[in-house]
């Protein structure tokens, strides 16, 4: 499977590190990593990989601003695998992610790219058996991918010994720091060896993220995509003025009458709205799955697998799941509610066109939402057009 990336023009990247490597063969990687990279479907590095893998494998602190669909997960996966001492049975790399789903996806990428290496990886996440965590740490698992709460708990209980950790990677740092994990993350930082390398990936650079860079990073290499380039290429963005909340559902049904879509993700701002919309759509005979943070992990896994396999055509989700829904065939994202946090907009609509695939995002905008939509346009230097009457043609 060949991987395509959203093209990023070199002129849109600001960096204080000038070494750009255009081939995986020139990155001085272990031969079995290169074998795993090609086996996974990568042919040449994406823009972020060309610039970030080398400084990370050299042990430098790195701050990379990259959105979904740019190959950022493989960037730190490849780098972590390169830095692991395969003979040392102890945790050497810690990767934090804001959601369980994202942590499991990262674990999956590490497993695939590290297929030909003797490296162990474990996901330490909430909603799973603590016994599995304890056994993994006792066995000397080398890479841990986890969510902040569970990881901190394991460190506090002294099952996770941090003395051999040489790499700390934070993915979606902006989301983690704004989601109430800040204190746990700071506590984790303080329990790691002082010499630990820090790699931070974030789609946006709010104050919380910049604060971490000054407190915990040492002269980091910065690779920043300019803000006005952050909206994913290939996503057509539209809005429908629904005037008021009560009109949204009828509008959604009308929309489905006029388009033919394989699969869609619909985002709502609250769990209660997700449940309300699911019930209403099922009553209209739509095949719908719903997913939110309060569901048990096993249910969430089942629902995601159903959606990936195509047995469910519509996935309704809250913002927590905006990061980590990796479904290749999604061609339409509907923001039933505009996100309350404008920085989440990119993560929602980015689902529709991962790795350069085209996608359509449709925003339902009430009269009260117009101001927020203008803020989103300004924040991303983008334009959200009114939905044309011939919208169906985009899906033929």
Curated annotation (Swiss-Prot):
The superkingdom listed in its UniProt entry is: Eukaryota
Q: Describe the reaction catalysed, as an equation.
A: ATP + H2O = ADP + phosphate + H(+)
The UniProt entry annotates the motif Q motif at 22-50
Q: Does the keyword ATP-binding apply?
A: yes
For the ligand (ATP), the binding residues are 66-73
The Helicase ATP-binding domain, residue ranges: 53-223
Q: Which Gene3D superfamilies match?
A: P-loop containing nucleotide triphosphate hydrolases
Give every Helicase C-terminal domain span. 234-395
Give the CC-aspect GO terms.
Answer: cytoplasm
Q: Where is this motif: DEAD box?
A: 171-174
MF GO annotations:
ATP binding; ATP hydrolysis activity; RNA binding; RNA helicase activity; translation initiation factor activity
The role this protein plays is: ATP-dependent RNA helicase which is a subunit of the eIF4F complex involved in cap recognition and is required for mRNA binding to ribosome. In the current model of translation initiation, eIF4A unwinds RNA secondary structures in the 5'-UTR of mRNAs which is necessary to allow efficient binding of the small ribosomal subunit, and subsequent scanning for the initiator codon.
Record text on subunit structure and interactions: Component of the eIF4F complex, which composition varies with external and internal environmental conditions. It is composed of at least eIF4A, eIF4E and eIF4G.
Name of this chain's protein: ATP-dependent RNA helicase eIF4A
Q: Which gene encodes it?
A: TIF1
């Amino acid at each position: 499977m060949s991987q395509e990336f959203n093209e990023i023009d070199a002129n849109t990247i600001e960096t204080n590190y000038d070494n750009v490597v255009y081939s995986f063969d020139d990155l001085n990687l272990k031969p079995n990593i290169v074998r795993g990279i090609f086996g996974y479907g990568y042919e040449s590095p994406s823009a972020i990989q060309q610039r970030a893998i080398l400084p990370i494998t050299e042990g430098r602190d790195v701050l990379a601003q990259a959105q979904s669909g740019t190959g950022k997960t493989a960037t730190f996966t490849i780098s972590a695998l390169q830095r692991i001492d395969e003979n040392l049975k102890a945790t050497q790399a810690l990767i934090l992610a804001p959601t369980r789903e994202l942590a499991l996806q990262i674990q999956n990428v590490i497993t695939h790219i590290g297929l030909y290496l003797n490296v162990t990886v474990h996901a330490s996440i909430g909603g799973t058996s603590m016994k599995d965590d304890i056994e993994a740490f006792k066995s000397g698992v080398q890479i841990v991918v986890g969510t902040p709460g569970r990881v901190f708990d394991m460190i506090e209980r002294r099952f996770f010994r941090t003395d051999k950790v040489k790499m700390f990677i934070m993915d979606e740092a902006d989301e983690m720091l704004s989601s109430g994990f800040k204190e746990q993350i700071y506590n984790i930082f303080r329990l790691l060896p002082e010499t630990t390398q820090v790699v931070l990936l974030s789609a946006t650079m709010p104050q919380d993220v910049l604060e971490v860079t000054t407190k915990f990073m040492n002269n980091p290499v910065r690779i920043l995509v300019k803000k006005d380039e952050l909206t994913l290429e290939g996503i057509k963005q539209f809005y429908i003025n629904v005037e008021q909340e009560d009109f949204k559902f009828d509008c959604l049904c009308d929309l489905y009458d006029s388009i033919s879509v394989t699969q869609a993700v619909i985002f709502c701002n609250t769990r209660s709205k997700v449940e309300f919309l699911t019930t209403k759509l099922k009553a209209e005979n739509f095949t719908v799955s719903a997913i939110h943070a309060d569901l048990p992990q096993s249910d969430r896994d089942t629902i995601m697998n159903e959606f990936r396999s195509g047995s469910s055509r519509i996935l309704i989700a809250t913002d927590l799941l905006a990061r980590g829904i990796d479904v290749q065939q999604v061609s339409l994202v509907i923001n039933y509610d505009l996100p309350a946090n404008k920085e989440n907009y990119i993560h929602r609509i980015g689902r529709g066109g991962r790795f350069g695939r085209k996608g359509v995002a449709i925003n339902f905008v009430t009269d009260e939402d117009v101001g927020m939509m203008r803020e989103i346009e300004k924040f991303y230097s983008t334009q959200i057009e009114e939905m044309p009457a011939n919208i169906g043609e985009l899906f033929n």
